[in-house]
């Protein structure tokens, strides 16, 4: 379970974040703070794994608060969600080692995607006693090999995302639904289905209907045999 603290002075935005987080498995909100002072008090009172931090708060800039958080709560990861677009804020955040930087307004899909990616990376780090270069490249998003030149792909299909879909299917011999694919790659079910259906159309994957006990049958996707 990933414990999240929300530091946001706009209560409406904080409520939106809270609602979206509650829709995701594996996350729990430990509390909300409306300013820097409340943020430090919240982190002192409750153990947090991840802090969603706004920059423009009433009593202090979020970026100015980060060194204090790093010193007092080194185990807390920080993700900035802000309307601040000045480059200097991003530079300060990067130097402080933040997990991500999101600019408001953030779409629900993007918000969920970033949290699921964080969850995946955290799980990967906690499950491996040692790291490899490929694992490091995956964590930092480097060393990506594109499966096809961008000009060969239709509109709405990105080569990097397509590669992630193929890798997910490659490691799932039992097949994956669009929802399961979306969770693995940190995207919506609609996006995952679009990419999976594209692979089916290129005969690089196949789809089969799986009938459950109740409800409508689901399409499961399998990587096509070489």
Curated annotation (Swiss-Prot):
UniProt cross-references to CDD domains, sorted A to Z: REC_citrate_TCS
Domain Response regulatory: 3-119
Keyword tags: Activator, Cytoplasm, DNA-binding, Phosphoprotein, Transcription, Transcription regulation, Two-component regulatory system
Gene3D superfamilies associated with the record: 3.40.50.2300
SUPFAM superfamilies cross-referenced by the UniProt entry: CheY-like (SSF52172)
SMART domains: REC
Subcellular location(s) of the protein: Cytoplasm
Post-translational events: Phosphorylated by CitS.
Name of protein: Transcriptional regulatory protein CitT
Species of the source: Bacillus subtilis (strain 168)
